[in-house]
Amino acid sequence: MNVPAALRYTKDHEWIQLLDDGATALVGITDFAQSELGDIVFVELKPAGTALKEHEIFGTVEAVKTVADLFAPVAGEILEVNAGLDSAETVNQDPYGSGWMVKMKLADPASVANLLDAAAYRELIGG
């Protein structure tokens, strides 16, 4: 199972990557999550401009047999949604790259440090 060391993770299986400016980040679902969901057929995300509280639902992922909510790892505002997810299978193929979900402006960039690091996330998923 792929768990990149440079990212932070939630117990709900989202990842977050701080961008170079230190105030914005990309958010997506983990390799473990996409594997557990199976073939993803549709992704619905709240639009750019939406303010989110930590743990607030920012969208859903629909797979062949289930629908899963997406939870904001930290508080902030959605700046951009990934238009490439019109092809939802991108999440299965590249969850940490072209399968990212939203770009966020973080309310408190330091809050990312409170999330799980790669070792703690691996332990959570039993890997």
UniProtKB/Swiss-Prot annotation:
One Gene Ontology CC term in the entry: glycine cleavage complex
InterPro entries documented for this protein: 2-oxoA_DH_lipoyl-BS (IPR003016), Biotin_lipoyl (IPR000089), GCV_H (IPR002930), GCV_H/Fam206 (IPR033753), GCV_H_sub (IPR017453), Single_hybrid_motif (IPR011053)
Cofactors that this protein relies on: (R)-lipoate
Cofactor note: Binds 1 lipoyl cofactor covalently.
Domain of life from the UniProt record: Bacteria
Described purpose of this protein according to its UniProt entry: The glycine cleavage system catalyzes the degradation of glycine. The H protein shuttles the methylamine group of glycine from the P protein to the T protein.
UniProt cross-references to PROSITE patterns, sorted A to Z: BIOTINYL_LIPOYL, LIPOYL
An example Gene Ontology biological process: glycine decarboxylation via glycine cleavage system
Gene (UniProt): gcvH
Classification via HAMAP family: GcvH
NCBIfam families: gcvH, PRK01202.1
Family: Belongs to the GcvH family.
Organism annotation: Chlorobium luteolum (strain DSM 273 / BCRC 81028 / 2530) (Pelodictyon luteolum)
Protein name per UniProt: Glycine cleavage system H protein
The keyword Membrane is annotated on this UniProt entry: no
Assembly with partners or alone: The glycine cleavage system is composed of four proteins: P, T, L and H.
N6-lipoyllysine, modified sites: 65
A Pfam family the protein falls into: GCV_H
Keywords: Lipoyl
Occurrences of domain Lipoyl-binding (ranges): 24-105
Organism ancestry: Bacteria, Pseudomonadati, Chlorobiota, Chlorobiia, Chlorobiales
Signal peptide location: none
